């Protein structure tokens, strides 16, 4: 069973790599440019999950939440910069008509969607951890900051 799974995964990766090689380098560069901020965000989520697993004090929770917010806001800024840079790009517009580019983006977005769904327990853990602590000035500040960060991220989808 594990061998079949490994062969299947390898086959999918090979097909994706071949699709990338068939794509115009300019289009691939645009896709890579859009992927970069998401890599920052996914790393921030994973780091948050790891930190929450070891948090013992309120100050450690605050530090973990602040670090996540810093990185998540960096993601939003980089994403918006890319969006602005490529707003009127002919390369981006031509990608809608290119099956290889379209497929590469769809595959990446599906993978990203799955990773973000897998991260939901981390966010739930963060929120419940913040709610378990007293209403100190610092906890309230971090709650507000986390809420504002999530709101910024949500605006990307509109």
Regions found by a protein language model. Give the residues of each.
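Short, low-complexity interaction segments enriched in Ser/Thr/Pro/Gly
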Residues: 1, 24, 110-112
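Long, amphipathic, charge-rich alpha-helical segments that form helical bundles/coiled-coils
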Residues: 68-138, 145
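Immediate post-signal-peptide N-terminus of mature secreted/exported proteins
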Residues: 21-73, 152-158
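C-terminal partner/receptor-binding element of secreted or periplasmic proteins
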Residues: 140-158
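Bacterial N-terminal signal peptides that target proteins for export
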Residues: 1-9
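Bacterial N-terminal signal peptides
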Residues: 8-17
């Amino acid at each position: 069973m594990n061998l079949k799974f490994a062969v299947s995964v390898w086959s999918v990766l090979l097909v994706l790599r071949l699709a990338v090689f068939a794509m115009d380098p300019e289009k691939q560069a645009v896709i890579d440019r859009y992927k970069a901020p998401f890599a920052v965000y996914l790393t921030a989520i994973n780091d948050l999950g790891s930190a929450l697993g070891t948090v013992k004090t309120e100050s450690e929770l605050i530090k973990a939440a602040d670090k996540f917010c810093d990185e998540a806001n960096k993601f939003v800024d980089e994403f918006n910069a890319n969006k602005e840079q490529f707003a009127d790009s002919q390369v981006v517009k031509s990608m809608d008509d290119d099956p290889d580019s379209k497929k590469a983006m769809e595959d990446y977005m599906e993978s990203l969607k799955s990773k973000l769904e897998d991260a939901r327990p981390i966010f739930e853990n963060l929120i419940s951890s913040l709610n378990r602590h007293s209403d100190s000035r610092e906890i309230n500040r971090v709650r507000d900051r986390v809420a504002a960060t999530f709101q910024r991220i949500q605006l990307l989808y509109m």
